[in-house]
Amino acid sequence: MRALSVFVALFSFLALSSASPGQDVAKRVTSGSLQQVTNFGSNPSGTLMYIYVPNNLATKPGIVVAIHYCTGTAQAYYTGSPYAQLAEKYGFIVIYPQSPYSGTCWDVSSQSALTHNGGGDSNSIANMVTWTISQYNADTSKVFVTGSSSGAMMTNVMAATYPELFAAATVYSGVPAGCFYSSSNQVNGWNSSCAQGNVISTPEVWGGIAKAMYPGYTGPRPRMQIYHGSVDTTLYPQNYYETCKQWAGVFGYNYNSPQSTQSNTPQANYQTTIWGPNLQGIFATGVGHTVPIHGEQDMEWFGFTGGSSSTTTTATTPPTTSTTTSSGGSSTSTGVAEHWGQCGGNGWTGPTACASGYTCTVINEWYSQCL
């Protein structure tokens, strides 16, 4: 009997020793509270990972990545957003990334952050997602991303750089993916021109910028729901229109001919514009920065509740670097671009000089504009 006991003890020891470190961590994560995970895989930017595993965990759970605003933290977004409570109701896991930078804005300006597997914050967040899928046997068709302000900017970037990971996204008061691009490759840089709504282009240009963040990708892309307030003085309301243009361009929708516009939806003074099953814009009249999180509407958009769109996304055409003239400006008869017009960028064959009084300003490597 003693020999049998020793054998059982040895077998148990070997079984525990053979388990991967990640599996060990997953077993130790306490459900029902915010927990930090430190060994989720490659973390090139030093982004912190926090996770909420509900007590009511589904057998094959979904995942919601909830990304905080500037000055925020994972703890602050966990406390100030409804996703943990909704996780208990619907059984999904919430990942709360935390920015590694002073001021805790996200890097949506460097080339590394704006490139699939480029080594920036987006890369680290993607690795959090794949770790969670592996450790919890998550449903890969129910992985979603959302964020507010700087987190909304990163949400757009995640949808552009890692479209294969996400089924849908909600964006609360952000800017288009690539709008904050730094020509000097500044990490976590601020772009006042973009923030103030002065970077204006066409759906084709914006869509091309998003597609170029994952060159060669032709698979499904996440459905996008864009919220913005009409009196936002941090990220000006023009960014709502530019973000909607971007995703209309990605999905091939006619931005100027939406399928429908619904007043007082999802509440009074909110207007919902639907371009197709993959894109909705929600403009909140009288609301500043940021639009409050609409948790139950998010659950419907993500497909956790009835009446939502299917989480099946639509494949898109291969990325292209071709660009077109900005809708905010045009070329004059003398061959120079007017105010707001495009004047440069990869593949640009139009005018490279601006009308008198304006300067051709590099917005990103794909787009320069007369400002």
From Swiss-Prot:
PROSITE patterns: CBM1_1 (PS00562), CBM1_2 (PS51164). GO terms for molecular function: acetylxylan esterase activity; cellulose binding. Residues 305-336 are annotated as: Ser/Thr-rich linker. Residues 307-335 have a biased composition (Low complexity). GO terms for cellular component: extracellular region. Pathway: Glycan degradation; xylan degradation. SMART domains: fCBD. The active site is at 149 (charge relay system). Residues 335-371 form the CBM1 domain. It is found in: Secreted. One of its GO terms (biological process) is xylan catabolic process. It catalyses: Deacetylation of xylans and xylo-oligosaccharides. Keywords: Carbohydrate metabolism, Cellulose degradation, Glycoprotein, Hydrolase, Polysaccharide degradation, Secreted, Serine esterase, Signal. Acetylxylan esterase involved in the hydrolysis of xylan, a major structural heterogeneous polysaccharide found in plant biomass representing the second most abundant polysaccharide in the biosphere, after cellulose. Degrades acetylated xylans by cleaving acetyl side groups from the hetero-xylan backbone. PANTHER family: FERULOYL ESTERASE B (PTHR43037:SF3), UNNAMED PRODUCT-RELATED (PTHR43037). Has a modular structure: a carbohydrate esterase catalytic module at the N-terminus, a linker rich in serines and threonines, and a C-terminal carbohydrate-binding module (CBM). The genes for catalytic modules and CBMs seem to have evolved separately and have been linked by gene fusion. Belongs to the carbohydrate esterase 1 (CE1) family. AxeA subfamily. Monomer. This is Probable acetylxylan esterase A. It comes from Aspergillus fumigatus (strain ATCC MYA-4609 / CBS 101355 / FGSC A1100 / Af293). The gene is axeA.
